[in-house]
Amino acid sequence: MAKNQTFAVVDLETTGTKMDGTNRIIQFSCVLVQNRKIVNTFNTLINPLMAIPADVQNLTGIHEKDVRHAPLFDDVAGTIYALLQDTVFVAHNIQFDYRFLNAELERVGYPELDLKGVDTVQLSQILYPCLASYRLQDLSAALKISHERPHQADSDAVVTAELLIRLMDQIHQLPDSLLRQLESMGDALLFETGMLFSNELRNRNMLKKHDADLIQVGKITFRRPRKFSDHLQERSKQPLLEAWPSSYEKRPQQLKLMEDVASQMRHGQPQVFFEAPTGTGKTLGYLLPAAHELQYGHRFLISTTTNALQNQLIDQEINQLDQFLPFKVNVVSLKGSQHYIDLDKFAHTLDQPQNDYTRLIQMRLLVWLTQTETGDLDELNFTVQQLPLFDEITHHGVQGLNQESPYYQYDFMRRRTDEMQNADFVITNHAYLIKHAAEFADQHRTLIVDEAQQLVTTTLQNNNQVMDLDAVKILADTLLVKMESQVSYSFANLIEQRLLTKAEYRKILQKIQVIDHTIPEFRDAMLQRFMKLQRIAKITETPIQFKKIFGFVKEHVNQYRKVQNAIRFLENKNPKLYRHFIELLDQQRLDSQSFNLFKAYFKLSNELLAKLKKWDRLALENLEKTADSLLMWLSYPQAQDGAHLRLHFGLMESQDFLQTNVYSFFNQVLFFSGSYFTSQTYQYFVDQLGAVESKHFKYQSAFDYEHQAKALLVKDAPDVNQVPADEYANYLSDQIIQICQAQHRQTMVLFNSNEMVEKVYDQLRDDERMQPWQILAQNVTGTAERLKKKFQSVQNVPQLLLATGTFWEGVDLPADQLETLVIAKLPFQAIQSPYNQIRYQRDERAGGNAFNDIALPEAVMRFAQGVGRLIRTQHDRGLVITLDSRIVNRSYGKQFVNTFPQGMPVKVIESEQLTAEITNFFNSKR
């Protein structure tokens, strides 16, 4: 294709998106691009001779009066048809624009366009693989392309043309090895989108040399491993606050926090607690003193609540340190192996048959690998569970790697282990910390626990595990059918083709048969021994005492050992069989049937082993070790046909576990929390942490809550414990609509359950009064991390976020990213969960009051965390609205009210007063 090929970048605005002949074009815009420059533009409004729907008018800003005297499509079709001849058709979502335009041209008598086409959505996904959104508006913001009038075709076409030029520039920067690999996969893309890779290769006069930081192995080009300088290197020593940048505000409470932290790092107790409320600058408050201590050879492990907050800590907070320090800080992020890509496995998927969508994902991954230093798949913002490819390429730990692979020495998990030895800061999350703390025993680090109020919850949750005995049986059955099938391709065919020996097959088959036959026997005996089969409750849960489960396993020890031996055999055999599979693949000895059978076997057998991962918990020696710390119970939904028997394991208390399995491996432990604690919740908190003897520092907020915020407590909301869930969802939906109609500002509603999020979302989505709003719902319209990024990129239309889980704590939404916070329900944990029932019963048996001792302090702490999402800077202003009347009408409600920051006005109102109160607050001046 000639260098001066013309690209016609087209955007349409239409009366609707359905291509059933009922909709019409109301604006056509085209921008011509040659040699990476805009050379011409064409734009026209079009009279559709039909009403323009209100939502289209609101979105595009094109009203019926604007098109009343515009030409008909018949009048401009000839011009459009001629304009597009001998061009490459480009659009952002080409499937819509090209097909819609063709349909309209044919409708008025013109032949169908026969043009090559390029889709800028797919190109953007490939070349900018880490973006959270590929909407044109979000892309233009991320790439800093001016976009003055989103959803108007002339503006969108110009922006798409500039985006196309950026994409061509990106392609021009790609190394030859990567470019050739992308070209070879280009047929999987829409239309002729892959032609841009071919064009670039054809136009290159010589090979483009690799960036010195890149290396090519096989079909993959990736970044070379980072080399950290020795952490004990001589670093110029300077006073803690000497290099304070002039652009960074000095906050008195933050400076006091830094001085206290520095003092405690040098001379403090083994465990110290810092209560630093929002606005104190908590994170920098411990990072800068820690960085200062690096000059004296100290090293740190920093743990926060979630992967999302872990990413935020690295991307935002750690990067700020460069402004304060005369040296570079070495940082490593640690997550579970499932977050990382296995290069060897990914390389083999490139040689396997794939559908077009999977090829697109592979192309994104290939580009990403030239950018990432970590191999952390979270960087890609994928919804991993929606991508079958990720089942094949995610890491399963260093122990499962093929040491003969050319990728072994470059493996990201192995790199991470090496980097960790010289890392100044190791950043992780609480879930990883409690499982892997022992790995830091010889590194003499100080442990910093950020969002410490969540460490206990995470500890208990991660020790709460389930083994579904019926699911094990189902998987074993499925696997045996796949292996022994007489009517379809089976392992017998693999043996005939000499892809597997008969001896190997028989051994594998025999072990799976052991599981298939023994687990149901064990399950039935357990059901008969421990469950009272009364068809009353939907789900019956029965706690199991240590003596009884120990005696049961002892009676059935032969069954237990049979299954345990089968598990161990499969755990050892599967990696070897997988390596054999890869060898056969490399030798091109597998046809599609044998390839698919091997893949099915590995998928099912790995799922089976995952279901049995907790089987060793039942070993007699393990039961004895955990007798005083482990809770066990059975659940069985008796009223259901085909009910599953599930065995649950839970940690009884967190204190001893944390002292033994976490704190003991570090020189010192510093706890930080941004929550407001009452005297009752603080005592509960430190007791659960097992840090009773710790020293306590407390700081004042820097915010003027009297003028920056206000709390509204709705006293006539229905009692959540007295009304059905659907009725309460109706009430919440009505109130949220009222709140949204009273203000068009970024609004977040915090829920306790995903189920209620879905119920409310379903009602709001279909309500005409919510048309101006973009509604985001956690786990409905996206993952927490994805929705957070969307919510943070403030749109021209107001956004409503329905959230739960991680949004209760640690998410930073300053300024106009969040102005109205709604708490749908006080955040009590579900009392009906068997785990909580056992905790509460145990407290009651010890003479306590479970509600006051456990349920209430946990809910109050979580409520305080939620309220803390609203005001994040001294310039923020916002409302917090509580739609749970218990905060007013129950005696314990005062404990929730006491967590509002000092000085924040609190007003009790009725539902009908909401609109007036909201309007008055936002109309008033500070």
Language model: regions and residue ranges:
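Conserved non-catalytic scaffold segment of RNase H-like nuclease domains
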Residues: 2-116, 129-151
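A substrate-engagement module of RecA-like helicase motors
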Residues: 237-238, 298, 307-422
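Acidic, Mg2+-coordinating catalytic module of metal-dependent nucleases/exonucleases
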Residues: 85-105, 131, 135-197, 880
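Conserved coupling segment at the C-terminus of the helicase ATP-binding
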Residues: 223-231, 239-240, 336-388, 443-445, ...
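Conserved motor-coupling elements within RecA-like helicase/translocase cores
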Residues: 416-423, 768-801
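Acidic two-metal-ion nuclease catalytic site recognized across multiple nuclease folds
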Residues: 1-2, 166-236
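Walker A/P-loop
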Residues: 267-288
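Conserved RecA-like P-loop NTPase helicase motor core
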Residues: 715-724, 783-884
